[in-house]
């Protein structure tokens, strides 16, 4: 999945916050919920529009970004 398939930003949607593409769910919800102790299954239960494939792709993209930053 390409980043544009996972997240997008549009000034008309959630005041331009980074959201999961095709939703109004901010990407921060995923990371803040994980940091708060929620499991991925719990997050997807609360925000089913994210979808498992997109959530896992977001985590992989974040991981790659960290590896690139550390290189």
Language-model segment annotations:
Residues 1-3, 70-71:
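Intrinsically disordered, low-complexity and often Lys/Arg-enriched segments
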Residues 2-42:
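A short, structured beta-strand/loop element
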Residues 25-71:
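Long, charge-rich, low-complexity alpha-helical segments
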